[in-house]
UniProtKB/Swiss-Prot annotation:
Cofactors demanded by this protein: Zn(2+)
Family as reported in the entry's similarity comment: Belongs to the universal ribosomal protein uS14 family. Zinc-binding uS14 subfamily.
Source organism per UniProt: Thermodesulfovibrio yellowstonii (strain ATCC 51303 / DSM 11347 / YP87)
Gene3D superfamilies xref list: 30s Ribosomal Protein S14, Chain N
Described purpose of this protein according to its UniProt entry: Binds 16S rRNA, required for the assembly of 30S particles and may also be responsible for determining the conformation of the 16S rRNA at the A site.
Name this polypeptide is given: Small ribosomal subunit protein uS14
UniProt: Zn(2+) binding residues: 24, 27, 40, 43
Length: 61
């Protein structure tokens, strides 16, 4: 419930531009955000493992 209200509040114009927080496009999580993909680490891993993000492969060395 608290996450939904934070997401709704994030849609309104902010008083200060510094307080803008990046959020995951899928789940709304604010921590572990990957800017290049617009996703949190959990959603990124899920989509990468299922092959939905083109060009992303598991690292092996």
């Amino acid at each position: 419930m608290a996450r939904k209200s934070k997401i709704e509040r994030a849609k309104y114009p902010a008083k200060f531009k510094v307080r803008v927080r990046n959020r995951c496009k899928m789940c709304g999580r604010s921590r572990g955000y990957l800017r290049d993909f617009g996703l949190c680490r959990i959603c990124f891993r899920f989509l990468a493992n299922s092959g939905k993000i083109p060009g992303v492969v598991k690292a092996s060395w």
